[in-house]
């Protein structure tokens, strides 16, 4: 591999001379040859400078995958600015936070999820970002035709001056990590890193690479951007569609006979299930680049079995590495491609490291660290102690893995995803690989959940193939033959589908929230079945205690959605009981304890004291309070234990089909 000190502008100028009429990008009828792309981006870059955008200014780019998106991206960089790539699936408020985080001064936008719901979404984003309307430009095909720039006579000398002296290693791109904190990290990438990472990645399959690719990866994410950059560098043709839908992808492959494809596992699975897959996809596709989360061996083998003429190439990386760090090759065996994430890219370094032992030997597990030409320039506006590249230049990925004797990288988990159960470290990936071997399982994700005894429990989320049923007992029996008993999931949660991020990757945080909610519901159901004790209050035998107790119970009754009328009735019954025990007891009752319990059918309020046994229906002097209590309770009973302690229970059934488990699970 030859590392190149080059830029997008120099690549375009070269290709415009070598193959001017070859189509570079095409999406939904908007196609640009290399000569057109070079000319149009020069003109647009000049206009961008005319908008008042200066070198190194941060400029936001927001829209679905399309040729015009890439035209705008190239033009921003040709103008010497920094392209801030926004996720087309995020709501306006979240985007405004990212705009503020990165100090973006201008918005270029096209069609996206928000504008499809609200035509004023871009205006609202500008307002939230404190930008005037003249700091916005709509590049969508419906709003603007870049082909008009082919006849534009604007002076592009300022652009030429910038591109001729442009430093390939400067900050040129900001891409956001899909983090779990309130705000993602803003990763600063260079043209040098993205272009050379693409070259290194492409070298892994250069002899098998076709003349065109159907790219389904979002270009606002590093993998999608790197792939299209590679195909641009090699003068290939990139086909796109705004919406990553199976029917649209099938149309592209069928129409243009694209031999190469790029996508995440969910996209390939959806294509397999498309009715025209056999006649419109299989005949053309030969190379399938797969990104996103790590593919299990069984999953990748199943896909390759379905794509009968294609080879699936697995890889690994992260945004901070532009992003690829390793990649498999078509000449690798299916076993190697399925069980590893490929061998290292030429020119880069990967080692396995632990804090305790330093660099590890072949086959030993530790954190994957990387060093080389593809690394980011850093996180924007984060101090040194929060950067993930150490003083020796090693990027700490946060992923666990090992390198085998053939120099292939194997991932065993993510440090933050490791489940710690009773002091044992458990890798979710190990369990997932065994679960997915079951023929009924389409997708699986194993996660940890808080547990009061073992610290964490092992929980599995699964998606079934259509028409398949899940036998949990059989699955557990099967797993007992493959993994240690303590690693077997406590529960299997079945989903119709997993939530996805805008780039098609699994929304792991969203899935975990759903799983934890369902787990909470299961645990609540167990507690509610036996009676869930939620409050105990003890008061003196004094009429002054009545009001605060009523206030407590009234507030609680309203909180759990009893109607105002029913709440008043509950309070009347409680008041009658308190007054009877406090004011009219036959003997000294001492302190009174009031407890609230929740059951599936009702709320139970219990009163306990040392007074004489009290049957409201038998005592002549308690008729009025008895009538009040019996009028409003759903059930009533009184008991006395062996020590002579009396307990009076009043049940109040839930209203209008209210489900206490669902209610508490949402809290």
Report each predicted region and the residues it spans.
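AMP-binding/adenylate-forming catalytic core of the ANL superfamily
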Residues: 90, 96-97, 261, 372, ...
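Structural core segment of the AMP-binding/adenylate-forming
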Residues: 51, 78-149
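Conserved AMP-binding/adenylation subdomain of ANL enzymes
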Residues: 195-212, 220-260, 274
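AMP-binding/adenylate-forming catalytic domain of the ANL superfamily
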Residues: 484-506, 522
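Conserved ATP/PPi-binding loop(s) of AMP-dependent carboxylate-activating enzymes
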Residues: 343-347, 356-388, 424-426, 519
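Gly/Ser/Thr-rich phosphate-binding loop
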Residues: 233, 258-263, 272-336, 349, ...
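Conserved pre-ATP/AMP-binding loop-to-beta segment of ANL
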Residues: 5, 20-21, 136-144, 154-176, ...
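Conserved AMP-binding A3 loop
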Residues: 33-35, 163, 172-196
């Amino acid at each position: 591999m030859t590392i190149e000190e080059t830029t997008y502008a120099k690549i375009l100028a070269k290709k415009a001379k070598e193959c001017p009429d070859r189509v570079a990008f095409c999406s939904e009828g908007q196609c640009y040859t290399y000569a057109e792309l070079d000319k149009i981006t020069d003109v647009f870059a000049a206009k961008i400078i005319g908008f008042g955008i200066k070198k190194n200014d941060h400029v936001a780019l927001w829209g679905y995958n399309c040729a015009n998106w890439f035209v705008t991206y190239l033009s921003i960089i040709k103008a010497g600015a920094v392209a801030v790539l926004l996720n087309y699936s995020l709501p306006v408020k979240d985007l405004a936070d990212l705009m503020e985080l990165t100090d973006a001064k201008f918005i270029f936008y096209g069609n996206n999820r928000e504008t499809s719901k609200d035509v004023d979404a871009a205006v609202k984003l500008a307002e939230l970002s404190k930008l005037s309307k003249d700091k916005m430009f709509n590049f969508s095909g419906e709003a603007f035709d870049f082909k008009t720039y082919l006849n534009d006579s604007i002076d592009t000398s300022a652009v030429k001056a910038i591109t001729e002296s442009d430093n390939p290693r400067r900050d040129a791109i900001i891409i956001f990590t899909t983090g779990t904190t309130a705000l993602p990290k803003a990763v600063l990438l260079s043209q040098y890193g993205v272009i050379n990472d693409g070259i290194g990645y492409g070298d892994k399959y250069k002899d098998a690479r076709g003349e065109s690719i159907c790219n389904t990866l979002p270009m606002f994410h590093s993998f999608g951007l790197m792939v299209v950059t590679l195909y641009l560098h090699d003068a290939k043709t990139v086909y796109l569609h705004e919406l990553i839908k199976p029917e649209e992808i099938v149309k592209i492959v069928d129409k243009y006979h694209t031999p190469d494809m790029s996508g995440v596992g969910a996209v390939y699975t959806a294509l397999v299930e498309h009715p025209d897959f056999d006649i419109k996809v299989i005949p053309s596709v030969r190379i399938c680049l797969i990104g996103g989360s790590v593919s299990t061996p069984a999953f990748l083998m199943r896909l390759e079995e379905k794509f009968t003429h294609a080879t699936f190439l697995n890889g690994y990386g992260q945004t901070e590495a532009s992003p690829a760090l390793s990649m498999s090759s078509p000449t690798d065996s299916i076993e190697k491609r399925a069980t590893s994430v490929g061998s290292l890219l030429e020119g880069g370094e990967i080692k396995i490291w632990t804090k305790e032992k330093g660099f590890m030997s072949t086959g030993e597990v530790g954190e994957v660290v990387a060093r080389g030409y593809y690394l980011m320039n850093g996180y924007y506006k984060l101090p040194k102690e929060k950067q993930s590249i150490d003083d020796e230049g090693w990027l700490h990925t946060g992923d666990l893995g090992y390198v085998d004797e053939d120099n292939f990288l194997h991932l065993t988990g993510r440090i933050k995803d490791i489940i710690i159960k009773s002091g044992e470290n458990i890798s979710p990936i190990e369990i997932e690989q065994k679960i997915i071997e079951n023929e009924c399982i389409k997708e699986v994700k194993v996660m940890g959940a808080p547990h009061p005894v073992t610290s964490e429990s092992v929980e599995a989320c699964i998606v079934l193939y259509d028409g398949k049923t899940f036998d949990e007992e059989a699955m557990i029996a099967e797993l007992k033959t493959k993994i240690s008993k303590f690693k077997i999931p406590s529960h299997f949660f079945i989903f119709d589908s997993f939530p996805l991020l805008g780039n098609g990757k699994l929304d792991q945080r969203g899935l975990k929230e759903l799983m934890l909610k369902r787990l909470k519901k299961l645990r609540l159901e167990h507690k509610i079945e036996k009676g869930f004790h939620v409050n105990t209050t003890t008061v003196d035998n004094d009429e002054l205690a009545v009001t605060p107790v009523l206030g407590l119970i009234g507030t609680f009754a309203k909180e759990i959605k009893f109607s105002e009328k029913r709440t008043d009735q509950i309070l009347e019954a409680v008041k009658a009981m308190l007054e009877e025990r406090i004011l009219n007891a036959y003997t000294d009752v001492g302190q009174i304890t009031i407890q609230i319990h929740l059951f599936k059918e009702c709320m139970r309020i219990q009163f306990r004291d040392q007074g004489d046994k009290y049957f409201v229906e038998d005592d002549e002097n308690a008729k009025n309070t008895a009538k009040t209590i019996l009028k409003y309770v759903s059930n009533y009973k009184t008991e006395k234990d062996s020590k002579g302690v009396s307990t009076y229970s009043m049940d109040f059934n839930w209203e209008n089909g209210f489900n206490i488990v669902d209610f508490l699970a949402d809290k």
